[in-house]
């Protein structure tokens, strides 16, 4: 039986969030609605989730000693990682000492780098994936590319949001793709994965919730990426019944293997009735921002319920929906957003501005959401709203 105490009192139910981006911000809001005391931790001050948490700490989360000090001081009932760049070995130690890591410390450790999760999916669970090789040196990387052939994809084993990821079409791309992968890794230069290119029709995120009542699959989310970064997403993605059933089979296999409770974003490639596993995040997914307008319970609300051991009897879909990112390029610590009235002038639209404290280059600063009679109409509406927003530096 779940019991939630009073925030900022001796009975408080405390959640410590590791990583305070826009996804974490929505998780904090949902936890706050359920009366949970939330402590937010990230490497920089005034991150989005810090702005809505009870209190916050600025810590390099790859520093296990510093991370442990904060967790031991706060004594949270739940530790909820929101990003990959965390000292996962420390989380494993803390879990062994009695702390609860969501969904599990092992899941966080396996998914923080592409090697752990790929080997689990392909070699232990025998799930369909692209052919792949790992490489530590340029020589091994060049051999992997030669073996897999063109086109192929190279990614750092540790990165997120498409950083360091590129498509190779010929030998002319070899050096620049290697250099780009070395620059884009979360932990600096290092190991890469080279993947054979799959001739897929579309890719989906199957948001999968492990909760006290079992496993719930949300309607598949389609999305469009540029340079490995999400630009727009929509729900539901049209699929054949066979492809949907296979997607759910793959998602259940990998989330069962990871264990624990919470929402997982399972990324899959689809062609006809064929499905290939790509990646999984043991937390809400950026493409799942569309659920803020498409469902009665967003992915963030579902994550909060699952964490706390609360039931999820049903998730109601409101109809075809879409999200389109607000992705300006500039340099500022005082960004402003104008023309919001025009962006919200159509029915069934919404905007989330993330409140990121600075921009230095291209950065996702918000998202526009829309519902309509069809996915195509919803996508067009969300894109119109996004394009209407004027970003001032």
From Swiss-Prot:
Identify which top EC class this enzyme belongs to: ligase
Q: List ligand-binding residues for N(1)-(5-phospho-beta-D-ribosyl)glycinamide.
A: 22-23, 82, 286, 356, 363-364
Question: Where are the coiled-coil regions?
Answer: none
Keyword check for Ligase, yes or no: yes
Q: Name one Pfam family in it.
A: PurT_C
ATP-grasp domain mapped to chain residues: 119-308
Residues binding ATP, per UniProt: 114, 155, 160-165, 195-198, 203
Origin: domain of life: Bacteria
Alphabetized UniProt keyword annotations:
ATP-binding, Ligase, Magnesium, Metal-binding, Nucleotide-binding, Purine biosynthesis
| PROSITE patterns named among the record's database cross-references | ATP_GRASP (PS50975)
**Database matches in PANTHER family:** FORMATE-DEPENDENT PHOSPHORIBOSYLGLYCINAMIDE FORMYLTRANSFERASE
Q: How does this chain assemble?
A: Homodimer.
**Similarity-based family:** Belongs to the PurK/PurT family.
Q: What does this protein do?
A: Involved in the de novo purine biosynthesis. Catalyzes the transfer of formate to 5-phospho-ribosyl-glycinamide (GAR), producing 5-phospho-ribosyl-N-formylglycinamide (FGAR). Formate is provided by PurU via hydrolysis of 10-formyl-tetrahydrofolate.
Q: What is this protein called?
A: Formate-dependent phosphoribosylglycinamide formyltransferase
């Amino acid at each position: 039986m779940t019991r939630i105490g009073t925030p900022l009192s001796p009975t408080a139910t405390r959640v410590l969030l590791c990583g305070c981006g826009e996804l974490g911000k929505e998780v904090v809001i949902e936890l706050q609605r359920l009366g949970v005391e939330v402590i937010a931790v990230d490497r920089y001050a005034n991150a989005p989730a810090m702005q809505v948490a009870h209190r916050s700490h600025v810590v390099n989360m790859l520093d296990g000693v510093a991370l442990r000090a904060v967790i031991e001081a706060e004594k949270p009932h739940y530790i909820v990682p929101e990003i990959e760049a965390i000292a996962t070995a420390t989380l494993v130690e803390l879990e062994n000492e009695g702390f609860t890591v969501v969904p599990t410390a092992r899941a966080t450790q396996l998914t923080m780098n592409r090697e752990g999760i790929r080997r689990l999916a392909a070699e232990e669970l025998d799930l369909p994936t692209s052919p792949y090789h790992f490489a530590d040196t340029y020589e091994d990387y060049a051999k992997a590319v030669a073996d897999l052939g063109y086109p192929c994809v190279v990614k750092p084993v540790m990165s997120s949001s498409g950083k360091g990821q590129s498509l190779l079409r010929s030998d002319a791309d070899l050096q620049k793709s290697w250099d780009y992968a070395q620059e884009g890794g979360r932990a600096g230069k290092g190991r890469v994965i080279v993947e054979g290119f799959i001739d897929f029709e579309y890719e989906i995120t199957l948001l999968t919730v492990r909760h006290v009542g079992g496993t719930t699959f949300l309607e598949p989310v389609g999305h469009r990426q540029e340079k490995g970064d999400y630009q727009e997403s929509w729900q539901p993605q049209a699929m054949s019944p066979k492809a949907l059933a296979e997607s759910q089979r793959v998602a259940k296999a990998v989330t069962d293997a990871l264990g624990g409770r919470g929402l997982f974003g399972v990324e899959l490639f689809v062609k006809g009735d064929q499905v290939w596993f790509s990646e999984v995040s043991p937390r809400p997914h950026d493409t799942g921002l569309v659920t803020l307008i498409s469902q009665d319970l967003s992915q963030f609300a579902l994550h909060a319920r699952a964490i706390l051991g609360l039931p999820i009897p049903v998730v109601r879909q409101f109809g075809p929906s879409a999200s389109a990112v607000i992705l300006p390029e500039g340099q500022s610590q005082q960004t402003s957003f104008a023309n919001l009235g025009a962006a919200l002038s159509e029915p069934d639209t919404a905007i989330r501005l993330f409140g990121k404290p600075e921009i230095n280059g291209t950065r996702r600063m918000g998202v526009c959401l829309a519902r309509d009679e069809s996915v195509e109409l919803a996508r067009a509406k969300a894109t119109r709203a996004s394009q209407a927003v004027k970003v001032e530096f």
